[in-house]
Amino acid sequence: MTVGLFGGSFNPPHVAHLVVAEVVRDQFGLDEVWWIPNATPPHKPNDELAAVQHRLAMTERTVEGNPAFRVCGVEVERDGVSYTVETLRVLQDQHPDTDFALILGSDSLDHFADWHRPDEIAERVPFIVYKRPGAIESVADPRFVNDVRYAAAPVMEISGTEVRARRRAGRSIRYLVPEAVRAYIDTHDLYRPTD
């Protein structure tokens, strides 16, 4: 089995995530895409981060209905910072007959050399990279150039930052997130001003 690992804060998961995951799955013939919400992302500030149980629940609602997508809680179940290399070690030990690939935005690839143990990550899995607005097109560090495949996913100007800002401003987020996620955000009153 070939599986794409799609990690992120998913704060919240939105339709661009869905489009990227499906395009990557189709283009590279992946059997499944495992969505991995980061419990404690090392490169993101926690000031706007919804509680991990909310982000996990929203991600589950995002993938329902697509049998090739599943949510993997490996980082949620682990204490401490969510380092990709540790996630790969665990998943490769648990699933020795599965071929994994790491799905990354081009913005993440731009700073990949700064990640925790990037050489080990590159030894463990190939990268499938999708373009993010404003990111550099090429691999910044030549050590990783042979491990990168590029996805032909459309560049979508939707981000979790935009969704949260619209929500704080009292504006609609309909069609930016799946309807089940929008309902969850409303029910749990997420991303509202704290004043």
From Swiss-Prot:
Pathway annotation from the record: Cofactor biosynthesis; NAD(+) biosynthesis; deamido-NAD(+) from nicotinate D-ribonucleotide: step 1/1
Cross-referenced InterPro entries: Cyt_trans-like (IPR004821), NadD/NMNAT (IPR005248), Rossmann-like_a/b/a_fold (IPR014729)
Keyword Transferase attached: yes
UniProt catalytic activity: nicotinate beta-D-ribonucleotide + ATP + H(+) = deamido-NAD(+) + diphosphate
Q: Which Pfam families does the annotation name?
A: CTP_transf_like
Which GO MF terms are attached to this record? ATP binding; nicotinate-nucleotide adenylyltransferase activity
Query: What pairs make up the disulfide bonds?
Result: none
Might you name a Gene Ontology BP term for this protein? NAD biosynthetic process
Enumerate the UniProt keywords alphabetically: ATP-binding, NAD, Nucleotide-binding, Nucleotidyltransferase, Pyridine nucleotide biosynthesis, Transferase
Q: Which Gene3D superfamilies match?
A: HUPs (3.40.50.620)
Catalytic class of the enzyme = transferase
Which Enzyme Commission numbers does its entry carry?
A: 2.7.7.18
Tell me, what does this protein do in biology? Answer: Catalyzes the reversible adenylation of nicotinate mononucleotide (NaMN) to nicotinic acid adenine dinucleotide (NaAD).
Family per record:
Belongs to the NadD family.
Q: What is this protein called?
A: Probable nicotinate-nucleotide adenylyltransferase
Q: Which organism is it from?
A: Salinibacter ruber (strain DSM 13855 / M31)
Identify the taxonomic lineage of the organism of origin.
Bacteria, Pseudomonadati, Rhodothermota, Rhodothermia, Rhodothermales
